[in-house]
Amino acid sequence: MSQKAIKGYINLIIPAGGATPAPPIGPALGQRKVNIKTFCDEFNNSTKDTEKGVPLPTLITVYEDSSFSFKIKTPPASYFLKKYARITKGSSATKKEAVVGKVTMDDCREIAKLKMPDLNTKDIEAATKIICGSAASIGLEVVGN
């Protein structure tokens, strides 16, 4: 069986159950002659069990015959961190200038377990450090050991 020729890739962050032909999805798919309604229906169907509105990074592979496939990844670390810290927005200031909330090391470890498939490590301690770095970058203080 021969593989289809790949025309290109599209990276989008789409809310779960919220794929619509409106920007940014419609224009990105339309430029590559992909059937937008079909994509939206398939995406919304595959995310129907996920909490509505959760941002999902999605890699769409577009083939030469205008067909497509897509892979949905885990939500961004910042989404989980904000949820655990019970805040709606990260800090607009850099580093330690403005701490907007706190998360525990156990929270970071829990998030790392959820994010493991999308991180570039198989070691839970390294993954936890990655998540702690993300926490610092959005103005969260990591407490505990």
From Swiss-Prot:
Keyword annotations of the record: Methylation, Ribonucleoprotein, Ribosomal protein, RNA-binding, rRNA-binding
GO terms, molecular function: large ribosomal subunit rRNA binding; structural constituent of ribosome
GO biological process, one term: translation
PROSITE patterns to which the protein is assigned, alphabetical: RIBOSOMAL_L11
Post-translational modification: One or more lysine residues are methylated.
GO-annotated cellular components: cytosolic large ribosomal subunit
Subunit structure: Part of the ribosomal stalk of the 50S ribosomal subunit. Interacts with L10 and the large rRNA to form the base of the stalk. L10 forms an elongated spine to which L12 dimers bind in a sequential fashion forming a multimeric L10(L12)X complex.
Stated role: Forms part of the ribosomal stalk which helps the ribosome interact with GTP-bound translation factors.
Family statement drawn from the similarity comment of this UniProt entry: Belongs to the universal ribosomal protein uL11 family.
UniProt cross-references to HAMAP family, sorted A to Z: Ribosomal_uL11
Protein name from the UniProt record: Large ribosomal subunit protein uL11
